Amino acid sequence: THETDEIPDEQTQQTGFKVSGTKLLDANGNEFIMRGINHPHSWFTAQDDTALEAIAATGANTVRIVCGSGQQYNKDSVESLNKLTDKCKELEMIAILEVHDVTGKDDTSLLETAADYWIEVKEALIGKENYVILNIANEWVGNWDGQKWCDGYTSVIPRLREAGIKNTIIVDAAGWGQYGQSVTDYGEQVFAADPDANTMFSVHMYGTAGKNKATIARNLKLSTDKGLCMIVGEFGW
């Protein structure tokens, strides 16, 4: 794992993080292995600085931050997002921003609305490609419908790119993030929908995807065997 305090030169700063096969490369072109913690900003906004400082103190190089688009949770403004990402940069952590409002929802229009939100606040993303990653929506698609998951993301990813958002994108698996097979079956199509070829995938390991060693290995290996970049975005029970 490479620390994030190396200052990229001007040229590589413009490209930021980049997916390369099964690996994520940082702005210096080094493989970046995430070690991080989730922070529920939307529900504990007054504790952001305290929480982020405590997370950094663990040695984490990444923090995944719960944000709100206004559909269900309080809407984060550009200023709110900037404050979060600036603090992460100060603490030498990569910020992963995700919208939590569509968690477990199966309606494609809600994913489109999440994409609309990111386009609205794109000023908080553009120019920060070397320390901000975009996790479009937390656990969109609650059922095990890989085709719907694929159709939704192949629709919104090009829209985000057309809006000028160049940050690395993370897409959570279907089935509340636990249906890794959706990535195995359709991940290549979702990746191909990104004109920047800079999309990676995440599976959330709870009682289904993380129930035992064999299941954990299968949920990761079947996708990486197809050349896709995978992370575990959440885990617990």
State where each predicted segment sits.
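N-terminal carbohydrate-binding accessory modules
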Residues: 3-62
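Short beta-strands and strand-loop turn motifs
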Residues: 34, 64-68, 96-100, 135-137, ...
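The substrate-binding groove and active-site-proximal loops of carbohydrate-active enzymes
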Residues: 68-72, 101-109, 137-143, 204-207
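Short, charge-rich amphipathic segments
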Residues: 12-26, 46-51, 81-88, 92-94, ...
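Extracellular glycoside hydrolase catalytic/binding regions
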Residues: 16, 45, 115-119, 123-133, ...
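Short active-site-proximal "capping" loops at secondary-structure junctions
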Residues: 42-44, 68-72, 176
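Aromatic-lined substrate-binding rim segments of carbohydrate-active enzymes
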Residues: 48-104, 111-116, 154, 158-163
